[in-house]
């Protein structure tokens, strides 16, 4: 595909974006808003943001959800701005500095919450800063400005949603149905690989791909949930399917690991059975029916526990899959599956990374303030706003540097594009609302196509161009003001990029170590006789951490294997029949405290000391299990866990 080519699948969204911009423009001028530009800018960003993230037309519900987050973020930012102004109106410099800290605080929170919701916090940070900077000449107009800004943004969001509904957005339901079928086949093929016990790298690639696909399916579930309330039943089933899919991966990989030491556990009956190739979900269905008969014939005791658990999870997966595809009423059997264990939420491992983001945003905003006060430049405030926007939005993404470069390219492209609109197009269309709408629709159409291609600078160019062309009521054409605004955007982006380069983020290794120690803590916490604790479902949280580890350290197989081994140990110990008595219960609490100390230790020396203490406690615990005559289902997993911790002691403790 050529650089300027237009693919058929890109046209519908481009028309949708153009319609959203035109609607916002028309409504803004019709209701005599003072700055319709904010409504147009909001409509463009809300519609184009999900398309840029998806690399194509976003699925149904994505634009609505982003609009909802933008409303929340705007209201939080407006309230924070009003509070800061009321409290510090007599100290303008202090007021701006507090706003810089507020922007950093919001970036810190956005780095810790779910990526889907982080947009609202990033927006809240720079909205307060925009209000404080804008009202500097007339602080008494703060409430009026806040209300007007909220109104304009709500109008822009409503226009984006109307355009989305007008052009029948894509439903993700068919994609979900296809992925459910394909994922079941892939799960069966992984079990075949694990029973064959072939090349370890092939198995690693297979389970790694399945972890990514299961995570992607969870993202599809979120999209389906946003799409319509009629998918509520399918959403409940998909949530349970997520846990079942992770269970299937865990049981398959444990089957592979067991054969490293005890290959005789997997009998020839099962090896021959899993030799049969499968291509479709129907093939898997037939094989599972035969497999259940084989287990009924051989007996549960003669069946390896991993295969027995895998078949049970696959059968439940099949049952819920049919329910998702048909979206029928949930029956009693499904309800029993859905009433599963409560999911556990883990503490974020990226606290140091979040603190780096806090300092990046705060320092860049303070640098912008100093630049503005030192130069006295009329567009210093515009540069400061761009600094806050770039840092607030870039920090929550995996590669902030590339986001800043995207904004720089976008603001550079916006200068000649905005110049064309400011000097030629808008003055010649000022007397005709129709011509003005057509001119902006053309801009939205072509940039909408580039946004879907994820062209570097396209998103920044769309927002920056709309921001600098005259869309105020009434329109005034001052070239010096236009040039100041355009240059202010460029300078702000360059300053933000400079701060991102200077304040290095070296938290990657620390995050990896914290994640691995959280896996260890989870495995240790599974050693308990508390019934409520044993019923907690840690699996989704553990695999979410594993997915983060895979993204932070792509290709680092030893780390992935260690994490997966800890997950397997957690699942095996969770189901182990540990003897119930006060002596063991007290020791379980002691080991959990020590594991928590390992995670929270701030220095390598403390971490090594606590880790050594944990290893000593595990040694004592094994002796206690022998005294209390614990069965092999308990002693063997504990022995394997202790061996793994001894083997990887340095990787888990050293920076």
Curated annotation (Swiss-Prot):
The keyword Repressor is annotated on this UniProt entry: no
Its membrane topology: Multi-pass membrane protein
Keywords for this protein: Cell inner membrane, Cell membrane, Membrane, Transmembrane, Transmembrane helix, Transport
Any one GO MF annotation of this record: transmembrane transporter activity
Gene Ontology terms describing biological process: carboxylic acid transport
Transmembrane parts of this sequence: 13-33, 38-58, 69-89, 93-113, 121-141, 152-172, 370-390, 407-427, 431-451, 459-479, 482-502
Main subcellular location of this protein, as a coarse class: membrane
Region forming the signal peptide: none
Keyword Transmembrane: yes
InterPro entries: PHBA_efflux_AaeB/fusaric-R, PHBA_efflux_pump_AaeB
Induction cue: Positively coregulated with aaeA and aaeX by AaeR.
Subcellular location: Cell inner membrane
GO cellular component: plasma membrane
Family according to the record: Belongs to the aromatic acid exporter ArAE (TC 2.A.85) family.
PANTHER family on file: MULTIDRUG RESISTANCE PROTEIN MDTO, P-HYDROXYBENZOIC ACID EFFLUX PUMP SUBUNIT-RELATED
HAMAP family: AaeB
Function: Forms an efflux pump with AaeA. Could function as a metabolic relief valve, allowing to eliminate certain compounds when they accumulate to high levels in the cell.
Protein name: p-hydroxybenzoic acid efflux pump subunit AaeB
Taxonomic source organism: Escherichia coli O6:K15:H31 (strain 536 / UPEC)
Lineage per the UniProt record: Bacteria, Pseudomonadati, Pseudomonadota, Gammaproteobacteria, Enterobacterales
């Amino acid at each position: 595909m050529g650089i300027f080519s237009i693919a058929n699948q890109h046209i519908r969204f481009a028309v949708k974006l153009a319609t959203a911009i035109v609607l916002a423009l028309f409504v803004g001028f019709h209701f005599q808003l003072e700055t319709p530009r904010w409504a147009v800018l909001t409509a463009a960003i809300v519609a184009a943001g999900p398309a840029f993230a998806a690399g194509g037309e976003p699925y149904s519900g994505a634009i609505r959800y982003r609009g909802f987050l933008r409303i929340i973020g705007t209201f939080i930012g407006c309230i924070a701005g009003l509070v800061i102004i009321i409290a510090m109106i007599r100290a303008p410099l202090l007021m701006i500095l507090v706003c810089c800290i507020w922007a950093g605080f919001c970036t810190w929170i956005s780095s810790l919450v779910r990526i889907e919701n982080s947009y609202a916090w990033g927006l809240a940070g720079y909205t307060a800063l925009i209000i404080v900077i804008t009202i500097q000449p007339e602080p008494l107009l703060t409430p009026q400005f806040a209300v007007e800004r909220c109104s304009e943004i709500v109008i822009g969001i409503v226009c984006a949603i109307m355009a989305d509904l007008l052009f029948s957005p894509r439903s993700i339901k068919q994609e979900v149905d296809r992925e459910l079928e394909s994922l079941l086949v892939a799960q069966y093929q992984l079990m075949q690989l694990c029973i064959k016990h072939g090349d370890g790298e092939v198995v690693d690639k297979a389970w790694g791909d399945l972890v990514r696909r299961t995570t992607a399916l969870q993202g599809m579930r979120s999209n389906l949930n946003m799409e319509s309330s009629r998918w509520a039943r399918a959403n409940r089933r998909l949530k349970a399917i997520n846990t079942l899919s992770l269970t299937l991966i865990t049981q398959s990989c444990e089957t592979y690991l067991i054969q490293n030491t005890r290959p005789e556990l997997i009998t020839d009956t099962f090896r021959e059975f899993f030799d049969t190739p499968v291509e479709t979900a129907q093939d898997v269905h037939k094989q599972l029916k035969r497999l259940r008969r084989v287990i009924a014939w051989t007996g549960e005791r003669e069946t390896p526990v991993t295969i027995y658990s895998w078949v049970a999870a696959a059968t439940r997966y099949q049952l819920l899959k049919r329910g998702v595809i048909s979206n029928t009423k949930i029956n009693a059997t499904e309800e029993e599956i859905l009433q599963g264990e409560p999911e556990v939420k883990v503490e974020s491992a990226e606290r140091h990374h979040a603190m780096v983001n806090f300092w990046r945003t705060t320092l860049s905003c303070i640098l912008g303030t100093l630049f503005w006060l030192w130069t006295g430049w009329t567009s210093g405030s515009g540069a400061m706003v761009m600094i806050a926007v770039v840092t607030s939005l870039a920090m929550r993404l995996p590669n902030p540097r590339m986001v800043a470069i995207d904004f720089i390219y976008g603001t550079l492209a916006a200068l000649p594009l905005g110049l064309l609109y400011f000097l030629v197009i808008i003055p010649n269309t000022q007397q005709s609302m129709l011509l003005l709408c057509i001119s902006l629709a053309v801009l939205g159409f072509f940039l909408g196509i580039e946004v879907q291609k994820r062209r570097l600078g396209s998103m920044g160019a769309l927002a920056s161009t709309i921001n600098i062309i005259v869309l105020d009521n009434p329109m005034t054409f001052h070239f010096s003001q236009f040039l100041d605004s355009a240059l202010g955007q460029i300078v702000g982006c360059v300053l933000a990029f400079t701060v991102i380069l200077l304040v290095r983020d070296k938290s990657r290794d620390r995050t990896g170590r914290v994640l691995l120690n959280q896996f260890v803590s989870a495995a240790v916490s599974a050693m308990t006789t508390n019934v409520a604790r044993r019923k907690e479902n840690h699996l989704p949280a553990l695999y979410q951490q594993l997915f983060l580890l895979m993204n932070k350290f792509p290709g680092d197989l030893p780390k992935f294997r260690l994490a997966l081994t800890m997950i397997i140990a957690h699942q095996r110990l969770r189901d182990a029949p540990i003897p119930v008595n006060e002596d063991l219960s007290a020791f379980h609490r002691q080991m959990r405290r020590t594991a928590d100390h390992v995670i929270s230790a701030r220095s390598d020396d403390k971490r090594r000391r606590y880790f050594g203490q944990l290893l000593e406690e595990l040694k004592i615990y094994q002796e206690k299990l022998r005294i209390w005559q614990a069965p092999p289902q308990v002693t063997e997993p504990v022995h394997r866990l202790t061996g793994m911790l001894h083997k990887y002691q340095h990787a888990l403790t050293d920076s």
